[in-house]
């Protein structure tokens, strides 16, 4: 027993303001996206609107620098990845030319050398919002996310309802009162080759698609952790994609953040330890759903997790805590640790700080 406790010792490192992980973001930052290349961090979109910023983490005087604005308009839930020195941004949720909220399936490329954006003549075969993106062998892979037709239809209906609260209530009840499988979340794995700008089918989950999962990859393995199984209902599932050999294998690991799960959590690696932290969800929604209530989160308050879990010996252990619950920020690998930038806390408040989670000998260190 003592040995177990020792292995899960929580070390909460307290630092003065001038020793914070990174300078505060230029604006409170949530629901955006980010990537890192050659120790330079890039973040943008979400609550930052069309703005993008970069920060050289190795600079003596660390500061955020504004970049050229994103040409595709403000967006939430876009994803991004660096491939061969260029930053690619995939999809997201925003307004179309008619002012309607919609899911996009487009791709934009940013060239750091010229500080310029270009919209590629390439469209994914389905919408990309709530999806995850990771890079393997020079290609970007996308999976998960909401169904574009169902999501866009919901917002078209809300737009037509205007300010009629009775009609809006009916639309919401109709939208949320369905089983998880009736939302057709994306369970396909798509690959994007930047050299050809072509999308290809790369496989599909033998289980179900999720939205708002956390993703982390190392070598030939990628993990998808939690996320929504349907609007308002999270899952505690953890999926592993194994690219070892010629055939992609899908595995299901032990669950985490049970029983309700979270969405918008943070995932990363530190000294070969798989980390999962934070996220938001509705406590009691899973029980409601299992009892036949499809509108499972109706009347429930969104809660924000501060838990830090480590994957150890085939199971998840709660191994530490964030200073407060947080979700919907950016997870990046940095200094052999998990770097969290921004996010939102209770009440949906966007934040400007960063957190660094490190693991050594199964001991968690949290630097704020």
Curated annotation (Swiss-Prot):
Signal peptide limits: 1-19
EC number: 5.1.3.24
Subcellular location per the Swiss-Prot or TrEMBL entry: Periplasm
Positions annotated as Kelch repeat: 40-84, 86-137, 139-173, 174-219, 222-265, 287-336, 338-367
Single Gene Ontology MF annotation: racemase and epimerase activity, acting on carbohydrates and derivatives
Active-site residue list: 228
A Pfam family it matches: NANM
GO cellular component: periplasmic space
Keywords, in A-Z order: Carbohydrate metabolism, Isomerase, Kelch repeat, Periplasm, Repeat, Signal
Xref: Gene3D superfamilies: Kelch-type beta propeller
Annotated InterPro entries: Kelch-typ_b-propeller, NANM, NanM_proteobact
Catalytic activity field: N-acetyl-alpha-neuraminate = N-acetyl-beta-neuraminate
Assembly and interaction partners: Homodimer.
Family annotation (HAMAP family): NanM
Family: Belongs to the NanM family.
Free-text function comment from the UniProt entry: Converts alpha-N-acetylneuranimic acid (Neu5Ac) to the beta-anomer, accelerating the equilibrium between the alpha- and beta-anomers. Probably facilitates sialidase-negative bacteria to compete successfully for limited amounts of extracellular Neu5Ac, which is likely taken up in the beta-anomer. In addition, the rapid removal of sialic acid from solution might be advantageous to the bacterium to damp down host responses.
PANTHER family tied to this protein: LD33804P (PTHR45632)
Record's protein name: N-acetylneuraminate epimerase
């Amino acid at each position: 027993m003592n040995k177990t406790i020792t292995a899960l010792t929580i070390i909460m490192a307290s630092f003065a303001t001038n020793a914070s992980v990174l300078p505060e973001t230029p604006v409170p930052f949530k629901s955006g996206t980010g990537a890192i290349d050659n120790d330079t961090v890039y973040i943008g979109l979400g609550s930052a609107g069309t703005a993008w910023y970069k920060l050289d983490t190795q600079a003596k005087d660390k500061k955020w620098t504004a970049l050229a604005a994103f040409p595709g308009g403000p967006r939430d839930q876009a994803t991004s990845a660096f491939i061969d020195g260029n930053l690619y941004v995939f999809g997201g949720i925003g307004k179309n030319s008619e002012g309607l909220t919609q899911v996009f399936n487009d791709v934009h490329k940013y060239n750091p050398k010229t500080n310029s954006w270009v919209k590629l003549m390439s469209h994914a075969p389905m919408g990309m919002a709530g999806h995850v993106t990771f890079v393997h062998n020079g290609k970007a892979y996308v999976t998960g996310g909401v169904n574009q037709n169902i999501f866009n239809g919901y917002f078209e209906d809300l737009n037509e309802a205007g300010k009629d609260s009775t009609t809006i209530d009916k639309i919401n009840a109709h939208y949320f009162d369905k089983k998880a499988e009736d939302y057709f979340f994306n369970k396909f794995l798509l690959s994007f080759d930047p050299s050809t700008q072509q999308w290809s089918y790369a496989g599909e989950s033998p289980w179900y698609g999720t939205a708002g999962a956390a993703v982390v990859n190392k070598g030939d393995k990628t993990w998808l952790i939690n996320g929504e199984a349907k609007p308002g209902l999270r899952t505690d599932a953890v999926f592993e994609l194994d690219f070892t050999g010629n055939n992609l294998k899908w595995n299901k690991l032990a669950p985490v953040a049970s029983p309700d799960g979270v969405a918008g959590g943070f995932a990363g690696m530190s000294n070969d330890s798989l980390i999962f932290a934070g996220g938001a969800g509705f406590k009691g929604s899973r029980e409601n759903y299992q009892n036949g209530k499809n509108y499972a989160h109706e009347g429930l308050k969104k809660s924000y997790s501060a838990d830090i879990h480590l994957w150890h010996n085939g199971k998840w252990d709660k191994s530490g805590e964030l200073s407060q619950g947080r979700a919907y920020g950016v997870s990046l690998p940095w200094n052999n640790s998990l770097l969290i930038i921004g996010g939102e806390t209770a009440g949906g408040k966007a934040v400007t700080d960063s957190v660094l989670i490190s693991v050594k000998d199964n001991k968690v260190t949290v630097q704020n």
